[in-house]
C-alpha cells in the first residue's frame, strides 16, 4: 500500500473522542473489510453480552457472580438502589478520610501528620495502585507511597529500612479481598512486627481494604484500626482500581479521584456504543482478534512513550493475561486462549528489544501509547526549532513506520496529556476491550482458576515442609533424602523435599545438608 493509500486508510479507521481528546489508530493492522464483516455476528453477541453484564447478569458463571466494575464510576447503573447507595457512600467516605489525614485531623500519636504510606497488597491490589501512583502522583505528594507487593523478605526489609526514621508517621494500607491471601497477610505480619519493634501500636496506623466480614475485616474491627473500606465480590482484583483498592491510596496522595472516575465513565459511555467502527474498545478487540487469528497467536508489546506510563504494560499484563488466559471456553472445550503482554517504555525500548521486533520473529503486534503534551511549560530547543519532545515523537513515528515496512502491525493510542481523566479513560478502555474480546473467543474473563491452582500447590509445599522438619527433629543421625522422603510419607516428592531443605539450609534455620552439592541424591540431612 503506497503512502497516499495509507493516509486514506488512516483517516478511514481513525477514532477520535472529542471530550477526552483521545485518538485510536488501527490503520497499521492489515485487516480488510471482509474480515470486519465476518466478525459482525460475534460482535453483535459481544455487545449484547456486555449490556446484560452491566444490568447485573451472572457474567462470571464459574463463580456465580455479577461483574460490576462499570458501576463504580456510574453508580446509577447498579442493579439495586442499595448497591448504588453503597458505592456513593464509600466514595464519600474515602474522600473524607483522605482529607482528614492530609489536614492532620487524623494523625499518628507521635506526629502532627502522616507523611508516608505503606501499601500491602498483591496482584490487582498492587498493580493498579502502582500504575496510578507512578502516572499521577504529584512530585511532592501530601503522603508518599511505598509498596510491599511480594513475599520477598529482602524486599520488605528494603521498604522498612527506607522508612526507619519515619515509621512513626507512616500509614499502612492492608489490601486483601478475602483477608486470607498469604502474601498480604504475611506482609502485614512483618510490618506489624516492625511497628512493635519501634514501640508503635500498629492499629493506630492501619487501614483495612477488604470484604465485609472477612478475617482481615474482623481483625481490623477487633483491634480498632483507623478505618475499614469495603471490597465487593462483584469486582475482581484486576478491575478494582476504581474501587477502594485504588481510590484510597490515590486520594491520600492528592490525586483527583473524581476526575479519574469521570474519565472512566466517559470512556464507558463511548465503549457502550454497539457499532464496531465507533467503539474504541471494539476496535481494539477487533485488532487483537485479527493479530492473533482469534487464538492469541501473537504477543501484545506495549510501548508508552512517556516515563509516567512505564508501568502501564505491567498493569495491562495482568488485566489481559489473567482475564483471557484460559484453558477452557464457556462451553467446556479445551482452547488454551490468551494474549501474552510485555513492554516497558519508549524510546528506551528502541535501544533494547525493538531490534528483534523489527528484524526477528514476527510473533507480536505493537501498541504505541503517545502523549501529545511534552511537559508543563516551555521546552528548551535541543537543535534549532527542535525540542527533546520532538525527538521523542519522532522516535515513536519512526519506529511505527519501520515496523510496518517490515510487515509488523501496530496500534497507536494517543492522549493529550497524562492526567486523572485520561488515565481513568485508558483503564476503562482496556477493561472493556478485554470483556469484548473474551466474548469474541467465548471465554470467562472474570475468573482465574490457574491462580487458585498455584495457591493450592504452594500450600501443599508448605505442608510438606512441616512434615519434613518434624521427621528431622526426631532423627538422631543424618539420613538420606530417600529415607527422609519415605518417613515423611512423600516418596514421590524427593525433588521438592531437596529444594525445601536447600532453602532452609541457606537461611541457617536448623537444617544441615552434607555431601556433594553437584549430586543432590548423595546428600544427607540432619537437624542442627
Curated annotation (Swiss-Prot):
Keywords: Cytoplasm, Gluconeogenesis, Glycolysis, Isomerase. It is found in: Cytoplasm. Gene3D superfamilies: Glucose-6-phosphate isomerase like protein, domain 1. One of its GO terms (biological process) is glycolytic process. It holds the Pfam family PGI. The active site is at 322 (proton donor), 351, 455. GO terms for cellular component: cytosol. Its main location: cytoplasm. Transmembrane segments: none annotated. SUPFAM superfamilies: SIS domain. Its EC number is 5.3.1.9. It catalyses: alpha-D-glucose 6-phosphate = beta-D-fructose 6-phosphate. Catalyzes the reversible isomerization of glucose-6-phosphate to fructose-6-phosphate. This is Glucose-6-phosphate isomerase. It comes from Nostoc punctiforme (strain ATCC 29133 / PCC 73102). The gene is pgi.
